[in-house]
């Protein structure tokens, strides 16, 4: 359904569809683009808290407040409110890093790929780009450095919660077989003609 009905640049679903299919899923409040953080960025703490409560009501202990620190001002501004929401609603916190490349030194290669993907010139100041080179897979030590503002006890609790959430996951990726969405081909079409039609 996300591919066929909710597609907007990427597959997505609405809350009603999520309610229908939430069993067995783990949910986190997400990055700055997530619903909770978008409300905080708009200055609406009450709406952010209400949104977090709605997800907690649906997912129970499988809902987490996700903290990130990529040295961005918006994260520095909203992380304290996320922690406050987590404490007020008794939601476990996890720490993650939005990872778009393997190592810090891969940032320039990722930037070049973004230019190719978006057909942009690298010297265009208005093109989409990541604001810094912090979007890589970080070690626990690098995460501790990023979260140096957090006390040790809270940091270790967040690490444990992150590991607990990861341990609930069971994913097997079959290489060489792209997971394409299933769709029904209406009568009167072949696979090829229906693809051309849509």
Regions found by a protein language model. Name each.
Residues 1-198:
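Phosphodiester-processing cores and adjacent nucleic acid-binding clamps
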């Amino acid at each position: 359904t996300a591919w066929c009905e909710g597609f907007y640049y990427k597959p997505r679903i609405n809350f009603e569809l999520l309610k229908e299919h939430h069993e067995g899923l783990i949910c986190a409040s997400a990055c700055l683009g997530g619903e909770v953080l978008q409300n905080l960025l708009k200055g609406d703490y009450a709406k952010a808290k209400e949104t977090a409560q709605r997800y907690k009501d649906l997912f129970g202990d499988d809902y987490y407040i996700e903290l990130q620190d990529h040295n961005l001002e918006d994260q520095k501004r909203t992380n304290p409110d996320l922690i406050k929401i987590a404490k007020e609603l008794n939601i476990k916190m996890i720490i993650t890093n939005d990872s778009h490349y393997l190592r810090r030194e891969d940032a320039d290669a990722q930037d070049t790929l973004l230019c190719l993907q978006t057909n942009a010139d690298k010297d265009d100041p208005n093109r989409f780009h990541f604001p810094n080179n912090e979007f890589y897979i970080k070690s626990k030590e690098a995460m501790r450095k990023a979260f140096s503002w957090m006390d040790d006890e809270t940091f270790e609790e967040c690490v444990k919660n992150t590991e607990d959430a990861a341990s609930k996951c069971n994913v097997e990726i079959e290489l060489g077989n792209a997971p394409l969405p299933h769709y029904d081909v209406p009568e009167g079409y072949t696979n090829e003609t229906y693809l051309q039609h849509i």
